[in-house]
Regions:
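Cleavable N-terminal signal peptides of Sec/SRP-targeted secreted and luminal proteins
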Residues: 2-15
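Short Gly/aromatic-enriched secondary-structure transition segments
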Residues: 35-43
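Helix N-cap / beta->alpha transition motif
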Residues: 42, 58, 126-127
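Terminal low-complexity, poorly structured segments
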Residues: 1-5, 45-46, 58, 115
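Surface-exposed, low-complexity/disordered Ser/Thr/Gly/Pro/Asn-rich loops and linkers
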Residues: 57-69
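Accessory beta-strand-rich segments of carbohydrate-active enzymes
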Residues: 18-32, 46-47, 52-53, 72-204
Length: 205
């Protein structure tokens, strides 16, 4: 009987959990621009820019060099959603980002709910008291890892040896900054792929 009671409680708790993905209606823009473009989530900035024909395929010929401006900019993503009655009445209200690449501030209704700095983990954002009835605005502001990490490189009293880091292609000369970012190392270039230091909501929300 005790087992059955515990099982019933667990089943009841599981049934009371409601969740959904927030993958629809996203758009993005360059931080210094007011022009918005449609975005896909999960995804990344380079793919969104390619779909909008703002950049060419960086895997073709020498196009890699023509897209190095992307990682020097900040990028803004946003979507709007309306919570259900069940979501608004839930005891716990959490927005979970399974993956953010990489430096990002997340805002819900203009209140910061997360400051991300690691591509390799998930981020759980408590939105109790911020989630509201009607339309909610969810924003993710990605910051340039280049501008963020060059000062760290410059502050070192020595020069470190690092693995593949095509900083010359990136236009930052000998500033091999990849060790400072909790980001996939291949983004900074490898012998099998181009240097594409990208941004994005790369896993489900």
């Amino acid at each position: 009987m005790a087992f059955l009671a515990l099982f019933a409680l667990a089943a009841s708790a599981a049934a009371s959990v409601c969740q959904r993905t927030l993958h629809d209606g996203w758009r993005f823009r360059q931080g210094s621009s007011e022009i918005w473009h449609p975005a896909r989530v999960p995804g990344n900035t380079h793919l969104d820019l390619m779909r909008e024909r703002i950049i060419d395929d960086p895997f073709f010929r020498l196009n890699e060099r023509a897209v190095q401006w992307v990682d020097k900019e900040d990028w803004m993503y946003e979507t709007r959603f309306t919570p259900t009655v069940s979501e608004l009445s839930a005891t716990n209200q959490v927005i979970v980002f399974k993956g953010l690449d990489t430096y990002a501030d997340v805002y819900l209704n203009h209140q910061r709910i997360c400051e991300a700095d690691n591509m390799h983990r998930e981020w759980r954002c408590n939105v109790k008291g911020i989630l509201k009835e009607g339309e909610n605005l969810l924003e993710v502001y990605f910051k340039s890892p280049i501008r963020r990490n060059i000062p760290k490189f410059d502050a070192l009293p020595y020069r470190h040896n690092t693995g593949p880091d095509h900083s010359q292609i990136g236009g930052i000369f000998d500033k091999t900054i990849s060790p400072f970012a909790r980001t996939a190392g291949f983004e900074y270039g490898w012998d099998w792929g181009p240097r594409l230091v990208t941004f994005g909501i790369w896993r489900p929300v």
